[in-house]
From Swiss-Prot:
Residues 120-151 have a biased composition (Pro residues). Pathway: Protein modification; protein ubiquitination. It comes from the Eukaryota. It comes from Mus musculus (Mouse). This is Probable E3 ubiquitin-protein ligase DTX3. GO terms for cellular component: cytoplasm. GO terms for molecular function: transferase activity; zinc ion binding. Homodimer. May form a heterodimer with other members of the Deltex family. Interacts with NOTCH1. It is an enzyme of class 2 (transferase). InterPro entries: Deltex_C, Deltex_C_sf, Deltex_fam, Znf_RING, Znf_RING/FYVE/PHD, Znf_RING_CS. PROSITE patterns: ZF_RING_1 (PS00518), ZF_RING_2 (PS50089). It catalyses: S-ubiquitinyl-[E2 ubiquitin-conjugating enzyme]-L-cysteine + [acceptor protein]-L-lysine = [E2 ubiquitin-conjugating enzyme]-L-cysteine + N(6)-ubiquitinyl-[acceptor protein]-L-lysine.
């Protein structure tokens, strides 16, 4: 088993608080733009430590930092922000490398002590062709094609395409994932997907996750044009009602054979295009038994009850985020990220 796979297995298959990054990219980010890393740590209240390494890769671990309580879904959002920052750093590093290649080519071209002697001069003047009276000139020729990539950059790009990101060796029996088009050794990606059904490169989810929500529940949807949510006053409101009768816990629940009480939950979405998109995703999550689970209530401390399962719903029309209501400008975006983490997307 490769180092990357062993790290994934060691963190229970979820790796929710770990990120792998190539050493050159991490060194570039931490040395050239440390302020951006410091800002990410401060905004998301996390520490970022090197948890392991190979000759080419660091495994970074994110941990909550600062006084409790930690923000909801904080590690997931911090990990996503860090991956975005690393992607930007990788682009900047490649740009710097290209500029270095160009300067090296100019130096090899004979810069010497008087580089101005080697600069290309203006093109020679040419006599314009004689045209008959009234004739129009031909359109200018198309611009020349850009020069090909320097050999080293071309080799780097080809090496990336033929190197497996998991074992870091040459790809054997290449398998390309359908949605994100990342390629791996067939054996490597087969084992990786057994640990977690997501692309090790981008985190794109594959397969269908099924939860342990009680199967006897119903999701009822209605629309109220007279009920207006703050910040969405020009739209009506989608009212979602989740209804569960009492039942007995099954084998997939914490205490099989123990009874749980019934419950009814109500949630609200704006009846706008994005709100209806979230409604469609909520239906998928409910059908896959991911919206609720059975456990201990976070508000009452009562065990063996039906509880929310980390897909946040607005259970109040007003009051803002503190009272699980509106206005909350980023809620629809955040909840789609939570759904995406469970493999619920609109494609």
């Amino acid at each position: 088993m490769s180092f990357v796979l062993s790290r994934m297995a060691a963190c229970g298959g979820s790796c929710k608080n770990k990120v792998t990054v190539s050493k050159p990219v991490w060194d570039f980010l931490s040395k050239e733009t440390p302020a951006r890393l410091a800002r990410l740590r401060e905004e998301h209240r996390v520490s970022i430590l090197i948890d392991g390494e190979t000759s080419d890769i660091y495994v970074l671990q994110l941990s909550p930092q600062g006084p409790p309580p930690a923000p909801p879904n904080g590690l997931y959002l911090a990990r996503k922000a860090l991956k975005g920052l690393l992607k930007e750093a990788e682009k900047e590093l490649k740009k710097a490398q290209r500029q270095g290649e160009l300067m090296g080519c100019l130096a090899l071209g004979g810069g010497g002590e008087h580089p101005e002697l080697h600069r290309p001069g203006p093109p020679p003047l040419r006599a314009a062709p004689l045209l008959p009276p009234g004739a129009r000139g031909l359109p200018p020729p198309p611009p020349p094609l850009p020069p090909p990539l320097p050999p080293r950059l071309r080799e780097d790009a080809e090496e990336q395409e033929t190197t497996c990101p998991i074992c870091l060796g040459e790809i054997q029996n290449a398998k390309t994932l359908e949605k994100c088009r990342h390629s791996f050794c067939e054996g490597c990606i087969t084992r990786a997907l057994q640990v977690k059904k997501a692309c090790p490169m981008c985190g794109r989810f594959y397969g269908q996750l099924v939860g342990n929500q009680p199967q006897n529940g119903r999701m009822l949807v209605s629309k109220d044009a007279t009920l207006l949510l703050p910040s969405y006053e020009k739209y009506g409101t989608i009212v979602i009602q989740y209804v569960f009768p009492p039942g007995v816990q099954g084998a997939e629940h914490p205490n099989p054979g123990v009874r749980y009480p019934g419950t009814t939950r109500v949630a609200y979405l704006p009846d706008c295009p994005e709100g209806n998109k979230v409604l469609t995703l909520f239906r998928k999550a409910f059908d896959q038994r991911l919206t609720f689970t059975i456990g201990t209530s976070m508000t009452t401390g009562r065990p063996n009850v039906i509880t929310w399962n980390d897909i946040h719903h607005k259970t109040s029309c007003t009051g803002g985020p503190q009272l699980f209501g509106y206005p909350d400008p980023t809620y629809l975006t955040r909840v789609q990220e939570e759904l995406r983490a469970k493999g619920i997307t609109d494609d």
